[in-house]
C-alpha cells in the first residue's frame, strides 16, 4: 500500500517462491499511516514485511518466516508498535532503522542465521521500548548500533551466537531484567 490511511491488512496467507534478484516483499507499506497489519502469515519473499515512512501503525500477531532477507524491514517509520509477532528462519532477521517512538513487545525472533544475520537490529533508533521478547537461536540475538534512549527490558536472549552487541555509538540506554542463557558470547 502506498500513501494509504487507516487501512487493515488482516488474515492473509502470502507465500512466495522467488529468488533474491526477482522476489518482492509480501506486505509493503510506503508513506502510510494508522494502518493495522494483523494475523497474516508470510513466507518465501525478499522481505516478509517492509515499511518505509509509515506512522502510527500496529503490527500484531503475524508470522513472517523463511524469507530471503528480512522477516521485517522497517525504516523512517515513527510511532509504530510490534506486538506478538513471530519472525522465524529469515535470512537476516528483523531490522528497525532510522526511527523513534517504537514499541516492540512480546515477539519471537528465532533461528535467523547467516553471516550477517541477527534476531533484531536496532540501527539509529531512539526513544523506543523493547520489552518481553524471546530472541533465540540467531547468529546475533540483539544488535544495537546508533540506538539511544532505549529501554530493553524483560527479554529472553537464549542460544544465540552473540546474545547482545551494543555498539559504542549507543548512549543512554536502560538494559535491565533480561535473561541471558546458553549464548556463545
Positions of predicted regions on the chain:
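Extracellular beta-strand/beta-solenoid scaffold signature
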Residues: 1, 20-31, 44-50, 66-73, ...
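Short low-complexity stretches enriched in small and charged residues
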Residues: 48-52, 58-63
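Leucine-rich solenoid repeat scaffolds
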Residues: 166-185
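Parallel beta-helix/beta-solenoid
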Residues: 3-4, 9, 27, 31-32, ...
Amino acid at each position: 500500500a502506498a500513501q494509504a490511511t487507516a487501512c487493515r491488512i488482516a488474515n492473509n496467507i502470502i507465500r512466495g517462491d522467488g529468488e533474491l534478484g526477482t522476489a518482492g516483499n509480501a506486505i509493503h507499506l510506503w508513506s502510510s499511516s494508522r494502518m493495522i497489519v494483523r494475523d497474516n502469515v508470510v513466507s518465501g519473499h525478499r522481505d516478509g514485511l517492509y515499511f518505509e515512512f509509515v506512522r502510527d501503525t500496529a503490527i500484531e500477531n503475524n508470522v513472517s518466516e523463511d524469507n530471503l532477507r528480512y522477516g521485517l524491514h522497517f525504516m523512517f517509520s515513527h510511532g509504530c508498535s510490534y506486538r506478538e509477532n513471530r519472525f522465524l528462519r529469515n535470512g537476516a532477521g528483523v531490522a528497525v532503522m532510522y526511527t523513534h517512538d517504537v514499541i516492540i513487545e512480546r515477539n519471537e525472533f528465532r533461528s535467523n542465521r547467516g553471516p550477517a544475520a541477527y534476531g533484531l537490529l536496532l540501527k539509529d533508533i531512539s526513544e523506543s521500548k523493547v520489552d518481553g521478547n524471546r530472541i533465540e537461536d540467531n547468529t546475533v540475538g540483539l544488535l544495537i548500533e546508533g540506538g539511544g534512549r532505549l529501554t530493553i527490558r524483560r527479554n529472553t536472549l537464549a542460544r544465540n551466537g552473540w546474545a547482545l552487541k551494543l555498539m559504542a555509538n549507543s548512549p543512554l540506554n536502560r538494559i535491565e531484567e533480561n535473561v541471558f542463557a546458553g549464548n556463545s558470547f
